Amino acid sequence: MNRFGTRLVGATATTPPAPKARSNENLDKIDMSLDEIIKLNRKEGKKQSFPRLNRRLQQSGARQLRMRVRWGVQQSSGFGKTSVSRRGRVLPGKRRPYGVITGLAARKATGIRKGISPMNRPPLSDKNIERYFPALKRKTSLLRQNEVQRKPVAVLKRPNQLNRKNNIPANFTRSGNKLSHQKDTRQATFLFRRGLKVQTQLNTEQLIDDVVAKRTRQWRTSTTNGGILTVSIDNPGAVQCPVTQKPRLTRTAVPSFLTKREQSDVKKIPKGVPLQFDINSVGKQTGMTLNERFGILKEQRAALPFSKGGSRFVTVG
């Protein structure tokens, strides 16, 4: 044992000072038991793993504050509080606080940060926009302010338009009393196809009151019609007043010297008597009387031989 020790000492005499300390440690380990050597190795391993952490903890307070402000990490002072690194990870060797979010709650929290999936997305209301998308809310508010600034000042209406009590809307014929109008048109077409002239007169005052008063839907309106339907039937016996209308001149008037002068101003009366019968029946007439005609027919019937079943004609004697 002494020889081996003297050899090691002689060998380490020529080596630099750093390995000398290691050789002394090795000599101590030889004298130690196995359990002591394992404990010593564990201590040395821990010392080698923590120098980097100790260096970080020895940084100046100003530099730590600058880094925290830069990466958006809140300053936490006091013993036992967790410190967060640049990438958001908890540094080793620090005690975690109570009430750590784990499981489904942690997934929800990360989902809020990263973005919500379309399956679990909440309805897009003002509260949810403020909660999940604050930046978007700020942008929309700024856009609204710009729109309000750009919007021109509304021009005031004329006083006579404002003071009117019964302002008829522009789409009055479309919206108001649409069903009654359709009913009138159907009735008019039905009568017109049977040769009857139809004229509809709508009571405009009643229609205006209906539009102002009634705010109900179209299918709830009453079936009573405010219009008056008048039917005029052609009566040839009635005296019709002649309507004097000036003829339109499609071309320039012909000069007086070119027009033919009429020989007499008196109208020519046509000769003859007006016919009271069909003119086509004149050619069918003959000089034979009715008695002669019926006598010929009787003779023809008598000449025909009687059939077995008897005669179909009956002779009146």
UniProtKB/Swiss-Prot annotation:
There is a cross-link at K260 (Glycyl lysine isopeptide (Lys-Gly) (interchain with G-Cter in SUMO2)). GO terms for biological process: mRNA export from nucleus. Residues 1-23 are annotated as: Disordered. A motif (UAP56-binding motif) lies at residues 26-44. The modification Phosphoserine is found at S23, S60, S117. Its main location: nucleus. One of its GO terms (molecular function) is mRNA binding. Keywords: Acetylation, Isopeptide bond, mRNA transport, Nucleus, Phosphoprotein, RNA-binding, Transport, Ubl conjugation. The modification N-acetylmethionine is found at M1. Pfam families: FYTT. There is a cross-link at K139 (Glycyl lysine isopeptide (Lys-Gly) (interchain with G-Cter in SUMO1)). It comes from the Eukaryota. One of its GO terms (cellular component) is nuclear speck. It is found in: Nucleus, Nucleoplasm; Nucleus speckle. The modification Phosphothreonine is found at T14. Interacts with DDX39B/UAP56 and NXF1; interaction with DDX39B/UAP56 and NXF1 are mutually exclusive. Interacts with SSRP1; required for its recruitment to mRNAs. Interacts with CHTOP. Belongs to the UIF family. Required for mRNA export from the nucleus to the cytoplasm. Acts as an adapter that uses the DDX39B/UAP56-NFX1 pathway to ensure efficient mRNA export and delivering to the nuclear pore. Associates with spliced and unspliced mRNAs simultaneously with ALYREF/THOC4. This is UAP56-interacting factor. It comes from Rattus norvegicus. The gene is Fyttd1.
